[in-house]
Amino acid sequence: NQCPQAYSYAK
């Protein structure tokens, strides 16, 4: 995955 799940949560 290029973007970690944690990053998606912050979005």
Swiss-Prot record:
Localization in the cell: Secreted; Secreted, Cell wall
Superkingdom, taxonomy of origin: Eukaryota
Membrane-spanning residues: none
Leader peptide range in chain numbering: none
GO cellular component: extracellular region
Keywords: Cell wall, Disulfide bond, Secreted
Similarity remark: Belongs to the thaumatin family.
Protein name: Thaumatin-like protein 2
Organism: Taxus baccata (English yew)
